[in-house]
């Protein structure tokens, strides 16, 4: 979708007089803000997102952070971006490619221009296109003057100069003025898409309430951006994207990490249990710790541990004491927590472990997304150590998935791993706020004094063991990492007992009640099923929509429950002649499905630290139906081998 209505065009220039711009109605637009990590692109994108949410658009966002805390200014490694799609209909992704690119410097332009379709709009801060900044990123000539951007609609705006002029009246320093240029960009885009500034101004004044001079500078920059759009001839068109028709209810914008935190708080209330989070800060999971720390009034306790092991052990101790124990981490942290997680399996304590996956292995790509921890979640502990594993499909779905994970942990007395990922954690979308009073309670029972009690006596239906809070008179007992005797919990090395307890722990997980897998197959006779999990939901769903509009029959199923699987999963897989599993790993789900159900599930893999594009999934659909999918996957390995640097050849050998 071209927001400019006229395809490619020349660079625009200010005119001496102003004519009222044309107003064009659009169904959707994808905008990407890009600049240095210190340019405030995440804040700019977040505020534009809030404006869209208040306006009533459906939306989806995808931030992209540099891995360095602060890379050298003006360099490619330091580019930070924020992409948002807003629409007047239900959308599933933040968009494949931007229609509008806001580039605050040459590095931002160079890093992102390749994603912009021909005819797309580029709005650049021309003040930053100095010879020094151009040289930093390898531009020999200024692309704003050389004609290499002639395939795009380019608007050069001296944002820094105009911002400094706007704040001069209040005597703001040059440094403070330069820092406010992102608000100029926000004001300009708000004018272009008909968004009022009232809420952004209120946000700025609240955020900088203790520094009123900073607040005033940012407000002036915001209004200067709006006024520039109003008074310049450079932008001949403004755009209108009407509100979306969504199911009735009260909505708010929410990120995946925030939704997880809210879900945990509500789950604690529904279960009548205090929540204790033991966690060590790690990208991209730290926001869960930060958000939960704000909710002490809901009986939430947060503990920032000295390391990953301390975090999970504190949560496990809290679970032993009768609380809802929670720990959060990312991939490397899960590796460190594995022994304590095994202790949780052996002691059968209710524990929620959140893994916000990122690129690995080891430190890997801390700020990039991946889905490569599935096998670790399923099997990454010594011995037969089964746990329940769930995965949300979107930021808003994190709330429901957290509730379900806690329900399983408490009802079945088991650790549960919740697999989010960087794309879900940092992305955002509208979330319909639920009526908490209408949510079903999370049931659990504590043993009571005077009643028969054995720590490893089990509920006949769930196989959950009896649970007594330590210190309850008459219910003294012991549990630990050594094998326990069936019923009494006494330490036992007896072979038959160990065999029994291993099978009971496995049967408990296998017997967890999960709903049947739903399949999106409008015609009921598709030849191809795409099966996914986690954040691939949006790209797969959007690709299926596009394919169906072209007359292709394709079905989509998405797994929330990864252990145990839905009971009807095998039947669903066998229903379709062709089954493809797109994953941000090297085929982990496909490997599990092939082994368990003996179905020829083909893999579509991507490990670039970024999410699938719907266009990519569309190509995979066409290749699968044409019988060429295996060739595409083999080609990826071949290209990797041919591209490998070899001894004596250098990095590009």
From Swiss-Prot:
Disulfide linkage: none
Disruption phenotype annotation: CoA-dependent KG oxidoreductase activity is absent in a mutant strain deleted for both genes korA and korB, and this strain is impaired for aerobic growth in the absence of sufficient amounts of CO(2). Inhibition of the glyoxylate shunt or exclusion of exogenous fatty acids alleviates this growth defect. Simultaneous disruption of korAB and kgd results in strict dependence upon the glyoxylate shunt for growth.
Domain of life: Bacteria
Molecular functions (GO terms): 2-oxoglutarate synthase activity; magnesium ion binding
GO biological process: response to oxidative stress; tricarboxylic acid cycle
InterPro entries given in the database record: 2-oxoacid/accept_OxRdtase_asu, PFOR_II, Pyruvate:ferred/Flavod_OxRd, Pyrv/ketoisovalerate_OxRed_cat, Pyrv_Fd/Flavodoxin_OxRdtase_N, Pyrv_flavodox_OxRed_cen, THDP-binding, Transketo_C/PFOR_II
Record's keyword terms, sorted: Oxidoreductase, Tricarboxylic acid cycle
Gene Ontology CC terms: peptidoglycan-based cell wall; plasma membrane
UniProt keyword Oxidoreductase present: yes
Family annotation (PANTHER family): 2-OXOGLUTARATE OXIDOREDUCTASE SUBUNIT KORA, PYRUVATE-FLAVODOXIN OXIDOREDUCTASE-RELATED
Miscellaneous comment: Is extremely stable under aerobic conditions.
NCBIfam families: OAFO_sf
Assembly and binders: KG oxidoreductase (KOR) is composed of KorA and KorB subunits.
Name of the protein in its database record: 2-oxoglutarate oxidoreductase subunit KorA
Gene: korA
